[in-house]
Design a protein with these regions (language model features):
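Catalytic machinery of carbohydrate-active enzymes
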Residues: 1-166
């Protein structure tokens, strides 16, 4: 086995530790029949409340249906509650994890929190597409027009009470 034969694009590749097919079945890249090349990398930023993190986990199965060969990285303050068998990389919200995600590239990055640190993190992440809430001109901003309504209803109680959208 040579380094040039390592399949770095495989969903099972962990980098610093042996992959699951190697651990369980002694597979090595150059002869592995379980190679699962990553086509899409998604970062989910959901730092906040425990209940909110739990309520957003159905996104994982939805994205898996939309994007075959998906690799999900999720950064949160509650890493222990996320389904480890459905998310490739679960990171605690700390300096090391922020450093890691801001030095990688993603196809899609989604920030579901309106907290400043989450918004600034999305702004700093390298992603082809960004959704949710970001940071621009020293304040929270919508990453796409679809997030604008949610921001407005969050800014003003009276508009939120009149809200007919979800």
């Amino acid at each position: 086995m040579e380094l040039k034969e390592v399949k770095f694009d495989c969903r099972f590749f962990k980098g610093e530790i042996p992959c699951l097919p190697n651990k369980l079945r002694n597979k090595v890249c150059n002869t592995c029949d379980e190679h699962d090349p990553i086509k899409t990398r998604i970062l989910i930023i959901k730092l906040g409340a425990l209940g909110d993190v739990i309520r957003t986990t159905p996104l994982v199965s939805r994205y898996r249906k939309i994007y075959p060969n998906l690799h999900i990285t999720w950064i949160t303050q509650s890493p222990d509650i996320l389904p480890k068998d459905h998310i490739e990389k679960i990171l605690p919200f700390d300096f090391k994890s922020v450093f890691l995600v801001t030095h990688q590239s993603f196809d899609i990055a989604i920030n579901l929190d309106k907290d400043q640190e989450a918004c600034q993190l999305l702004a700093d992440v390298d992603a082809k597409q960004k959704f949710g809430f970001t940071w621009k001109d020293q304040h929270i901003a919508a990453a796409t027009p679809a997030a604008e309504h949610k921001l407005i209803t969050g800014f003003f109680d009276n508009i939120s009470k009149e809200n007919k959208k979800n």
